[in-house]
Amino acid sequence: MDKLSIRDLSLEGKKVLVRVDFNVPIKDGKILDDVRIRSAMPTIHYLLKQDAAVILVSHLGRPKGGVFEEAYSLAPIVPVLEGYLGHHVPLSPDCIGEVARQAVAQLSPGRVLLLENVRFHKGEEHPDEDPSFAIELAAYADFYVNDAFGTSHRKHASVYRVPQLFPDRAAAGFLMEKELEFLGQHLLVEPKRPFTAILGGAKMSSKIGVIEALLSCVDHLVLAGGMGYTFLRAMNRQVGNSLVEESGIPLAKKVLEKAQALGVKIHLPVDAKVAKQCDSGEDWRELSIQEGIPEGLAGFDIGAQTIELFSKVIQESATIFWNGPVGVYEVPPFDQGSKAIAQCLASHSSAVTVVGGGDAAAVVALAGCTSQISHVSTGGGASLEFLEKGSLPGTEILSPAQS
């Protein structure tokens, strides 16, 4: 990695501002999935062992900005943090201002302070409108650490402006290092071959950039989910009422042509689980794509033959990247295709397997095989943008590695 690491910092007795991504799902004040909190713990534990005072900065959800909204408070994070750390973690009721400055001043080495949601201030998402916001945050600490890969594609104050105020003192945390290692080194720089990318999800248009970027480095491209039907329509297949982006058909044709020119093998569904609607998961059947899906029916998952086809491609690959479910995984039995992909990745222990995006990560968790995947990225849009562009605003701005 060509960026400064927290291993390079002299931390004893120093205050460290750590940008974490605690944007976790919360219902009725309870956290539904704490993987993002757990993922930040190696960095936090390391800083504490070095006797640093740790100031945690995060956002949660999309508050209006400019006002406190209890629904987006980081208060539910506190008991989870305390459980992992084994000691009290104070929550500053604001991330800037006198109350925050006092909380930082009282913070002792070896302890953690959590600042309230940075998005309660418009200066976080609109740093040009309030440059003083980043300056106030930066004033708290001796060092800055970014461990929020999932937010690093945004030029927000705590991700992009604050590290600029720490020349030669803005470092990557352990989670950030791991993300850059797997998405960078293992996928973009030196992937073991054959290299296969599996892209699902609803919209092709939102992923056209990463599709075109991946064409230059993969050997196989598996396309399924809603976007798969757009590609099938581009090949004049009958897909009935399946989700198709009409405006994306010309783009799909160009992708197919480019793949052929580059020698990239495209794999599309050969059969599908179809129904009139997917709400109940009832009255479905499997149909061959060759025969076509009639009007009035739509595909909501890949069929058994496609599972077999995709599994064979996975098993013959040395590197696999997966983003986006291949069916409506929230509604059984349309979850079977996505779960089969997850289980196939998990069983292929000799390969480098990387899963990016919230939905694909959720499927892997539902299938009970997260621990068997080489790396489950904490970034959805961030992981795709990194693969498309090779860097992110929040990673570019970190200090260079010490020579």
From Swiss-Prot:
Q: In which pathway does it act?
A: Carbohydrate degradation; glycolysis; pyruvate from D-glyceraldehyde 3-phosphate: step 2/5
> What biological-process terms (Gene Ontology) are attached?
gluconeogenesis; glycolytic process
Pfam families, sorted: PGK
Membrane-spanning regions, if any? none
Name the domain of life this protein comes from.
Bacteria
Keyword annotations: ATP-binding, Cytoplasm, Glycolysis, Kinase, Nucleotide-binding, Transferase
- State any GO CC term: cytosol
Binding-site residues, ATP: K207, G299, E330, G357, G358, D359, A360
Known catalytic reactions? (2R)-3-phosphoglycerate + ATP = (2R)-3-phospho-glyceroyl phosphate + ADP
Extract one GO molecular function annotation from the record: ATP binding
Task: Kindly list the places in or outside the cell where this protein is found, as annotated in its UniProt entry.
Answer: Cytoplasm
- Gene3D superfamilies on file: Phosphoglycerate kinase, N-terminal domain
Q: Where does substrate bind?
A: D21, F22, N23, R36, H59, L60, G61, R62, R119, R154
- InterPro entries registered for this protein in UniProt: Phosphoglycerate_kinase, Phosphoglycerate_kinase_CS, Phosphoglycerate_kinase_N, Phosphoglycerate_kinase_sf
EC number(s) per UniProt?
Answer: 2.7.2.3
Its quaternary organisation is:
Monomer.
Q: Which family does it belong to?
A: Belongs to the phosphoglycerate kinase family.
Spell out the HAMAP family in the cross-references.
Answer: Phosphoglyc_kinase
This protein's name? Phosphoglycerate kinase
Q: Which species does the entry assign this protein to? A: Chlamydia trachomatis serovar L2 (strain ATCC VR-902B / DSM 19102 / 434/Bu)
Phylogenetic lineage: Bacteria, Pseudomonadati, Chlamydiota, Chlamydiia, Chlamydiales
